[in-house]
Amino acid sequence: MLMITSFTNPRVAQAFVDYMATQGVVLTLQQHTQTDVWLADESQAERVNAELARFLENPGDPRYLAASWTNGHMDSGLHYQRFPFFATVRERAGPFTLLLMAACILVFIIMNVVGDQRVMIALAWPYGPAVQYDVWRYFTHALMHFSVLHILFNLLWWWYLGGAVEKRLGSGKLIVITIISALLSGYVQHKFSGPWFGGLSGVVYALMGYAWLRGERDPESGIYMQRGLITFALLWLIAGWFDLFGMSIANGAHVTGLAVGLAMAFADTLNARKRT
């Protein structure tokens, strides 16, 4: 057996062990003056040390909390430090993630004050020749949401996935994904239903596709989406396509966003593999 590291805080040690278990690596803990982490299969040492370095950079990452939940240690007394809500939001998101969240919330408030129609006339996808050169319209449709559930669903996913991408890969990468997916998903949805649509879900589906495929093809990037979550997203997509919810859903934007995210992840991982 090989000792990987020692933690002064047993809660942190357990979080790392739980996460590695979800990656197929079995670690054991031994409690002395500190909590030692031991690896039985020494051939996995390089991989474990690489994961440890990422863990130490941000032990509060949602993936580690999710791993503890998966492994049943949420009620063992090994809980993460509790942070105020807004501090937690800021900690796990970069500036662009927060800026777009604030913009969506502001637009939602304005829509509820002055009415949807006035805001849509100003921000919707170009609806006629007179406004086709209003460049912002090709992107601002993503800022509009039409119910509390709509905006909560999109912003939670945006914070969870967009924040991870921005923290790991930088603001530039998140901005590029957002711009391309908003533009292309909006274009396709416009062809499906006309210009009167809105929501960040096309971008969210792009992030889902990007995070999942990036994690599958380039685990070292630290970007990933659990297979259970991507399965849920696909089932939601299928249910929306067949109108199982009885709601107006931008299916064209969802499918296009997912395709954009997958394509961008494939391109990025192809370049990464060439460099190695």
Swiss-Prot record:
GO biological process, one term: proteolysis
Highest taxon listed in the record's lineage: Bacteria
Chemical reaction(s) catalysed: Cleaves type-1 transmembrane domains using a catalytic dyad composed of serine and histidine that are contributed by different transmembrane domains
Keyword Transmembrane helix: yes
Keyword Hydrolase recorded: yes
Subcellular location: Cell inner membrane
EC number: 3.4.21.105
GO terms under cellular component: plasma membrane
Purpose of the protein: Rhomboid-type serine protease that catalyzes intramembrane proteolysis.
Protein family per UniProt: Belongs to the peptidase S54 family.
Protein name: Rhomboid protease GlpG
